Amino acid sequence: MATCPVLQKETLFRTGVHAYRIPALLYLKKQKTLLAFAEKRASKTDEHAELIVLRRGSYNEATNRVKWQPEEVVTQAQLEGHRSMNPCPLYDKQTKTLFLFFIAVPGRVSEHHQLHTKVNVTRLCCVSSTDHGRTWSPIQDLTETTIGSTHQEWATFAVGPGHCLQLRNPAGSLLVPAYAYRKLHPAQKPTPFAFCFISLDHGHTWKLGNFVAENSLECQVAEVGTGAQRMVYLNARSFLGARVQAQSPNDGLDFQDNRVVSKLVEPPHGCHGSVVAFHNPISKPHALDTWLLYTHPTDSRNRTNLGVYLNQMPLDPTAWSEPTLLAMGICAYSDLQNMGQGPDGSPQFGCLYESGNYEEIIFLIFTLKQAFPTVFDAQ
């Protein structure tokens, strides 16, 4: 397995008095600004999550480096008596509004406890910003207006984690990927299903999309173009030994063609991964407009060796490349962002990922040509 050279590598969050988990990354192209979010915890365990923190980075095109400002707490992203988890940033380019979605869970109630008792106490929350994350609105609890009575049909749920998606349709639809453990039968354990929260009015109101197949958990979505047709591609964690994917022809409302992606292996309990779409940089006959990039641990036994995978035929689950290594050793969750053209003329990406035994969250920049040079050699 080849190892990818990188343009920059820097630790943004390091475990000490507090632990940090669950990275989320957003690139604001016009501002040349990166926003790196994470959960700040009293310890590494989920039950000890506390707050969501942010570091702001300024990208310098001349040096191809990002200068990061100190950590700050997103103080508005707190529901009283609850811990804030699973940061999911989303930027509406049309209204220039930044949303930060997350879940709020009371006290030290664990996901396992909710699955065991089948009592859902998780809340869907959001804050927004009109100045690129410098100041934030008061918290909105969207649970009743968005989920309503369906909330009690779930044992628990979560969003993301990681970046969300604005579609290129006329409405500029906003999609927040999510999953819910549904209580389908009193005698059975709750089963996880991925789906999307959808807004057609720039975040004023939200609705539930329909579910992907069962055994789909933490997920991300990307918009892919196949000529004149657009599809929403969903890639989800599973317990099946490999990722699962599905596609939506109607902007995230319904998903179809659910497939296990055998080339994208999962460790025994699965792990979060990240996917982004980007414009095909090579003009070839019959080439698709959009390619996909995906990051995830490459070992089927453990969360180790972070790899990046390329798919030049996005809807074909067999078309994923072999991985190129981004980082050796223990790793876990990651989040990708497309940062436009890199210094070598190929697309450039930022990646924020968990390293070591959740000791660090590291940011790095690499280009497509660095990760997959043979794609360009074939031109």
UniProtKB/Swiss-Prot annotation:
Transmembrane regions listed in the UniProt entry: none
Source lineage: Eukaryota, Metazoa, Chordata, Craniata, Vertebrata
BNR repeats by residue range: 127-138, 197-208
Protein name, entry field: Sialidase-2
Domain of life (superkingdom): Eukaryota
GO terms of molecular function: exo-alpha-sialidase activity
The keyword Repeat appears for this protein: yes
Gene, per the UniProt record: Neu2
Subcellular location: Cytoplasm, Cytosol
Entry annotation: catalytic residues: D46, R303, Y333, E354
Reactions that this protein is recorded to catalyse: Hydrolysis of alpha-(2->3)-, alpha-(2->6)-, alpha-(2->8)- glycosidic linkages of terminal sialic acid residues in oligosaccharides, glycoproteins, glycolipids, colominic acid and synthetic substrates; a ganglioside GD1a + H2O = a ganglioside GM1 + N-acetylneuraminate; a ganglioside GM1 + H2O = a ganglioside GA1 + N-acetylneuraminate; a ganglioside GT1b + H2O = a ganglioside GD1b + N-acetylneuraminate
Species assigned in the record: Mus musculus
One Gene Ontology cellular component annotation held by this UniProt entry: catalytic complex
GO biological process: ganglioside catabolic process; glycoprotein catabolic process; oligosaccharide catabolic process
Family: Belongs to the glycosyl hydrolase 33 family.
